[in-house]
Every structure is written in structure tokens, then in C-alpha cells.
């Protein structure tokens, strides 16, 4: 699906989100296909139709993103992750693989919460551990709990790098991020977004870390996202197509 088609869908759904700046529109169209700086390849999107064609790419200066060269070039999907605090609450109650802890539980406890809550915090699962191939974003300069940009449904949202995958699949985010991106699809713990049209961008460097400035104790997802928006806007503005 081309960005113009996705934008049309977003207008129909009326989802509250941020408009894509021009540089991000150009990035979205430009980086689907080939990657000249492959950090690690051989991953799936959690399914079988596109094989192990997904890879972490460093072609955008100061950033890391996921893409696949299959089918002429594409990004990845958005499976729902419910790991962390309240992992069986609300729409996460039917998650077949939920765990009661995220990868950065110890770090986020410093901000007065027991762990990230997938029902509340819009986090992205980024990086792969335990199985081969592996990819550790920290090796390339990403910091735990740093701001990430997500292009979904023709719009821009901000989340944080909040978890890693124990296998070799990619394209996963918390329930609250899926609800921000695709409210019309009514995601839950066992149902996400299948199309490979979601661009996840991680940023390198400590400037991407919100720390105490993020509203970790927010009661609404939108309030948390709003608390990291200024950092996200600055990071996105610095990206070159």
C-alpha cells in the first residue's frame, strides 16, 4: 500500500494522530526496498508469507529502522504485545503469549512504576535476543526507554523502546500503541495489524531518552505520548531523507 492510500484510510478513520512532516513522507517512500547498511538480517514478521526477509537497517543517519526487500519493498506489521504490568488486564486478557515483565523493568522502576503497562504505555518491541539471528540496538547507539517514531495508518505517533523479542520475529508494539495507530481495527491481545506498512524508527544517542520528563504515571495513553512529543518532534526534524 502506497503512502497516499494509507493517508486516505487515515482520513476515513478519523484517528487522532500527528501529521507526517515532509521529510518523513520522503523517508517512508524512499527506504522500503534496498538497504545499503544492513545491521542484521534474517528475521520474520511473525508470519510465514514473507519468510526471513526482514532486516534492521542503518541507512538513515542517526536512526535504525526495520524493512523488507520482499514484494518490491515494505516495512513490517504490528503484532500486539501485552508484556509488563497488568499483562492480562482489559483487552490483553486474550494474549496467548503475554509475560509479566518487560526487558527494561529495572530501568523503568526508577520512575516510580513497577513496569511498563501495555494497556497504557505506547512501547515498541525492538531488538531480538536468545535465538539466532540476534540484534541488540544498544550496540548501535540506541538507549533503553528512548523515544521511537512510528509511521502507521498514514500518521505519526511516538512511543518508547520498551521491550525486546526473545525470538526472531519483528513488528510488535504494545496494545496501546496499536490502539493509537489502528483504532478502527479494534486490536487486542490476540489481534494486531497484518499489513507490512508500519515504519518503526529508533533513534541513537542519549538525546532520545526522555527520562524523568516523560509522564510515566499518566492515566491515559495520549497523555504519555504528549509528554514525549517535543523530543520526538526534534528527533524527526533532524532526519534526512
UniProtKB/Swiss-Prot annotation:
| UniProt keyword Secreted, yes or no | yes
MF terms in GO: chitosanase activity
Record function comment: Chitosanase catalyzing the endo-type cleavage of chitosan, the deacylated form of chitin. Chitosanase may be crucial in the degradation of the deacetylated portion of chitin in the fungal cell wall. Chitoolisaccharides produced by the hydrolysis of partially N-acetylated chitosan are known to have many biological activities, including antibacterial activity, immune-enhancing effects, and elicitor activity.
Protein name listed in UniProt: Endo-chitosanase B
Catalytic reaction(s) noted: Endohydrolysis of beta-(1->4)-linkages between D-glucosamine residues in a partly acetylated chitosan
The protein's predominant localisation is secreted
Cellular localization per UniProt: Secreted
